[in-house]
């Protein structure tokens, strides 16, 4: 009986983190694209500096870190929103809202996921394979660095990458409150930043401390901006599925800004995406990227906006799934670009 209860609890915790759905993968897209393309760029600049295997390893670690941290963020979101979720048809069965998971269990689960993310971030930004194989050895190295006065610099470097998304994840659920609307703050603003920021981490995972933090941010700014507007666009359509319940509960969401002109709002939100994409891709001398990114995204956006129907809120879910496939396609395009760069070495 005890074993059965533990299995049910584990299942509920996984559901609480949305690990039973495809949505956590969205949090990894920017990091994956950035890691792969940074690898392709560095191979082109300094072929002997890294190997494709290293880039793929860093890509895998970036995926795990973003995926797990998304889970931690949803735990915090659901805890803050538990009373609201209990009165919304789509969310009333979530583990915290339904009482299947206690606050203590949820908070412990959230802390464990946050610590796991921090550990993976340390591995990525240090680039040390031994950290994966032997955590005790990693601790010994950290102590040795501190004794020699080199521990704080590395820690500060890693915190620069982790703290922004940590703070944004904390603030996200409060962006849905009516008070936030008075300040013209919508949750999609914060969510866009959360999903876009891993692009900086992914680029740093390839270039490491060979590149200053400010230069990494500058390099990734067009990609971060592109992902930022993309997430606001697709999440506005996705959250519109709950429009009836949200209005009853006075939940703040960006689609309220569109009023009766939601379709035009989505067009306006989608428009900056290809512009930011152009700014990012101009750094790469690759027809393949121009064709697969700009061509693929433009065609997909046109199809999405044609089929979205404000009279059918469920069409927002279809648009969301279409963008998920677009993200998967872009991973493939970036992986091919990495292989193309490796073949020229």
Curated annotation (Swiss-Prot):
Gene3D superfamilies: UbiA prenyltransferase. Its cofactor is Mg(2+). InterPro entries: Prenyltransferase, UbiA_prenyltransferase, UbiA_sf. Keywords: Membrane, Transferase, Transmembrane, Transmembrane helix. GO terms for molecular function: transferase activity, transferring alkyl or aryl (other than methyl) groups. It is found in: Membrane. Pfam families: UbiA. Pathway: Secondary metabolite biosynthesis; terpenoid biosynthesis. The chain crosses the membrane at residues 24-44, 60-80, 101-121, 183-203, 220-240, 261-281, 286-306, 319-339. It comes from the Eukaryota. Its EC number is 2.5.1.-. One of its GO terms (cellular component) is plasma membrane. Diterpenoid pyrones display various biological activities and FDDP C shows anti-cancer and anti-HIV activities. FDDP C also shows inhibitory activity of 42-mer-amyloid beta aggregation that is involved in the pathogenesis of Alzheimer's disease. Coiled coil: none annotated. It is an enzyme of class 2 (transferase). It is a multi-pass membrane protein. GO terms for biological process: terpenoid biosynthetic process. Belongs to the UbiA prenyltransferase family. Polyprenyl transferase; part of the gene cluster that mediates the biosynthesis of diterpenoid pyrones. The first step of the pathway is the synthesis of the alpha-pyrone moiety by the polyketide synthase dpmpA via condensation of one acetyl-CoA starter unit with 3 malonyl-CoA units and 2 methylations. The alpha-pyrone is then combined with geranylgeranyl pyrophosphate (GGPP) formed by the GGPP synthase dpmpD through the action of the prenyltransferase dpmpC to yield a linear alpha-pyrone diterpenoid. This is Polyprenyl transferase dpmpC. It comes from Macrophomina phaseolina (strain MS6). The lineage of its organism: Eukaryota, Fungi, Dikarya, Ascomycota, Pezizomycotina. The gene is dpmpC.
């Amino acid at each position: 009986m005890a074993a059965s209860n533990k299995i049910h609890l584990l299942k509920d915790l996984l559901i609480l983190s949305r690990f039973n759905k495809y949505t956590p993968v969205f949090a990894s897209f920017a990091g994956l694209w950035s890691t792969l393309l940074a690898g392709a760029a560095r191979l082109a600049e300094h072929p002997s500096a890294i190997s494709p295997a290293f880039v793929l390893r860093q890509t895998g670690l970036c995926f795990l870190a973003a995926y797990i941290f998304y889970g931690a963020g949803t735990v915090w979101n659901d805890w803050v929103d538990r009373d609201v979720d209990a009165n919304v048809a789509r969310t009333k069965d979530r583990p915290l809202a339904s009482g299947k998971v206690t606050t203590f269990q949820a908070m412990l689960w959230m802390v464990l996921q946050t610590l796991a993310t921090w550990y993976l971030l340390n591995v990525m930004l240090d680039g040390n394979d031994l950290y994966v194989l032997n955590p005790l050895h990693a601790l010994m190295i950290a102590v040795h660095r501190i004794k020699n006065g080199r521990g704080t610099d590395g820690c500060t470097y890693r915190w620069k990458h982790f703290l922004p998304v940590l703070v944004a994840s904390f603030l996200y659920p409060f962006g849905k409150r009516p008070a936030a609307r008075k300040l013209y703050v919508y949750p999609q603003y914060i969510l866009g930043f959360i999903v876009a920021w891993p692009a900086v981490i992914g680029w740093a995972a390839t270039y490491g401390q060979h590149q200053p933090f400010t230069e990494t941010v500058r390099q990734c700014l067009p990609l971060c901006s592109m992902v930022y507007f993309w997430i606001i666009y697709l999440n506005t359509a996705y959250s519109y599925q709950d429009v009836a319940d949200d209005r009853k509960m006075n939940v703040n969401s960006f689609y309220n800004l569109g009023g009766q002109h939601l379709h035009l709002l989505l067009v306006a939100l989608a428009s900056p995406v290809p512009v930011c994409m152009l700014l990012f891709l101009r750094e790469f001398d690759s027809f393949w990227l121009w064709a697969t990114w700009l061509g693929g995204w433009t065609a997909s956006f046109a199809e999405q906006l044609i089929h979205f129907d404000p009279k059918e809120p469920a069409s927002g879910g279809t648009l969301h799934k279409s963008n998920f496939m677009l993200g998967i396609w872009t991973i493939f395009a970036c992986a091919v670009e990495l292989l193309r760069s490796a073949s020229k070495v």
